[in-house]
UniProtKB/Swiss-Prot annotation:
Ranges of residues in domain GIY-YIG: 14-91
A matching Pfam family: UvrC_RNaseH
Protein name per the record: UvrABC system protein C
Keywords for this protein: Cytoplasm, DNA damage, DNA excision, DNA repair, Excision nuclease, SOS response
GN (gene name): uvrC
Location relative to the cell: Cytoplasm
Length: 590
């Protein structure tokens, strides 16, 4: 911990508020809230933590805090700060999942539409529905039952819906407000759970039509009843009061939290939302933050009632959301809460089981790879790849896999310094020499296996440096590719021989992941260097633009393409003197 952090920790107040953790670049990486700032912020730097929290702590170089007058104010501020900074460790709602609704528009001649965007307008929203297909099926049923206008713009003549009996044709006929109001009330009653009453009314009309020998009309009514049954009675009833409510419950273990949300609409459990994310503060406070973000960030429709566990501050949620919040002690509502909690525990258990299986597969693949190469299990693998285009901007990259998983913290990039032109052998010698000279000098861990993404020449070049220059005894293998640039074989030994691996084995898949990753890392670095080089060359020989200003322009525009799209004024605003800006602008336009 640096001196500045220690001094700031000593000055933390005994008050509620929010804290913003920052990395070396002063980027906000995590936002949290606390009832007592001093206790919460200090807890990150004392005691032991799980792996995920420890990873966060290792990146913290600075922090700031904002004192609030209450816990509720801290919760609201935390939500706003997360929305503003989008910190990488506040990941609970990154996917922004939204659900579809059926909207009854507030127009002279109302329409029914399916939408995911709930606005504060005068329209009536019904939902959410589990998916867009369910919403469209329900709308299609309502279109059959109630002849509302379908067209977004009123046409000059009647459309097909009028001839099908699904529209009253307000485009050419004078439809009274009373008629529209009756249709709106009927649809509202239907969507609020009164479809059984509608079905009963239709059955009475069907029997009446049959008695009057109006068989076509009776058949039409029978079909409408069948559509209601097939569309609306797929869900099992869970409540009898038909109140729209959301049920929130959570479980946490091993540094992870799972929140389950049950959507109850018109007495039915129509859908659930599952969110899983790392836990960096107290579970009940993280849960409060989640609920606040759930409705503000994801544009979810606020129901009439919300159910939460009794461990949560009920009044704070009520003040935040301005809706009814209940903590049931018994009965059907309590059973719903317990069911949501049970599902959260199951989801966490499944996640940990999958992690364990993945680790077993990864470790098993590493062990099998060692057996295939006749070496000790290569727990630590370091892989190298070169990248250049006809010898220009040559670079190399090294990646690290530990127990079959990428360890990106130890990835390294290299600009080739001693080689000119397209010399992959010389480049490999330089990079391997630089890497392991430093490893020996700084007493860093040596790999159990070195993998070279290249042909025999590069493998032998790396071996020569490792064995003859540095006197190390590390197994070196090479990845051979087929004509489609896919992993085909593994080369090892002196002289090099093919180590045969089953194409569908876990160890072969591990090699593919290593080859793909080191190639991706090297290529992305080369593109970055090439882009900077192109940028620099455009700026060469322009009076008034030196190295410092070149770096400033690169940071401002990012690429030559964006700089070419810029106006003269844009270039001046980037801090370039008028004369130099004119010269640069003229050069870019050629």
């Amino acid at each position: 911990m640096n001196k500045q952090l220690k001094e700031k920790l000593a000055l933390l107040p005994d008050q509620p508020g929010c804290y913003l953790m920052k990395d070396r670049q002063q980027t906000v990486i995590y936002v949290g809230k606390a009832k007592v700032l001093k206790n919460r912020v200090r807890s990150y730097f004392t005691g032991s933590h799980d792996a995920k929290t420890q990873r966060l702590v290792t990146e913290i170089e600075d922090f700031e805090y904002i004192v609030t007058s209450s816990n509720l104010e801290a919760l609201i501020l935390e939500m706003n700060l997360i929305k503003k900074h989008d910190p990488k460790y506040n990941v609970m709602l990154k996917d922004d999942k939204t659900y579809p609704f059926i909207k009854l528009t507030h127009e002279r001649h109302p329409r029914l539409i399916v939408t995911r965007n709930v606005k504060k307008d005068k329209g009536r929203y019904f939902g959410p529905y589990p998916n867009v297909q369910a919403a469209r099926e329900t709308k299609k049923l309502l279109d059959r039952l109630y002849p509302l206008r379908k067209c977004s713009k009123l046409p000059d003549r009647v459309c097909l819906y009028y001839h099908l009996g699904q529209c009253l044709a307000p485009c050419v006929k004078d439809i009274s407000e009373e008629t529209n109001r009756e249709l709106v009330e009927s649809i509202t009653r239907f969507l609020r759970g009164g479809y059984n009453e509608v079905k009963k009314e239709l059955e009475e009309k069907m029997h009446e039509a049959a008695e009057n020998l109006e068989f076509e009309r009776a058949k039409e009514l029978r079909d409408q009843i069948a559509h209601i049954e097939s569309t609306m009675e797929k869900q099992k009833m869970t409540m009898n009061d038909l109140v729209d409510r959301d049920v929130f419950a959570y479980a946490y273990d091993k540094g992870w939290m799972c929140v389950q949300v049950f959507f109850i609409r018109q007495g039915k459990l129509i859908e659930r939302d599952v969110s899983m994310f790392p836990l960096y503060q107290e579970a009940d406070e993280e849960f409060l933050t989640f609920i606040g973000q759930f409705y503000s960030k994801n544009n979810h429709f606020l129901p009439k009632e919300i159910l939460v566990p009794d461990s949560i501050d009920q009044s704070m949620i009520e003040q935040l959301l301005e809706t009814n919040v209940h903590q049931p002690k018994k009965g059907p509502k309590k059973e719903l809460l317990m069911l949501a909690h049970k599902n959260a525990k199951i989801a966490l258990k499944e996640k940990f089981s999958l992690i364990e299986r993945d680790e077993e597969r990864s470790i098993g693949a590493v062990q099998k790879l060692g057996e295939a190469l006749n070496i000790y299990t290569p727990h630590r693998i370091e892989a190298f790849d070169n990248s250049n285009i006809q010898g220009t901007n040559p670079v190399s990259a090294m990646i690290v896999f530990i127990d079959g998983k990428p360890y990106k913290k130890e990835y390294r990039k290299y600009k080739i310094k001693t080689v000119t032109g397209p010399d992959d052998y010389g480049s490999m010698r330089e990079v391997v020499r630089r890497r392991y000279t430093r490893v020996l000098r700084e007493n860093l861990p040596l790999p159990d296996l070195i993998i070279i993404d290249g042909g025999k020449g590069q493998i032998n070049a790396a071996r020569d440096v490792i064995e003859n220059e540095l006197g190390l005894d590390i197994p070196i293998a090479g990845l051979a590719k087929d004509e489609k640039h896919r992993t085909s074989n593994l080369l090892i030994g002196d002289p090099l021989e093919v180590a045969y691996l089953e194409r569908n084995s876990q160890e072969f898949y591990l090699l593919q992941r290593i080859q793909d990753e080191v190639h991706r890392f090297a290529i992305s670095f080369h593109r970055q260097i090439r882009g900077k080089s192109a940028f620099q060359s455009v700026l060469d020989d322009i009076p008034g633009i030196g190295e410092k200003r070149k770096k400033m322009l690169l940071k401002h525009f990012g690429s030559v393409k964006k700089m070419k799209e810029a106006s003269l004024e844009d270039i001046k605003k980037a801090g370039v003197p008028a004369a130099a800006a004119q010269l640069l602008y003229d050069k870019l336009q050629k």
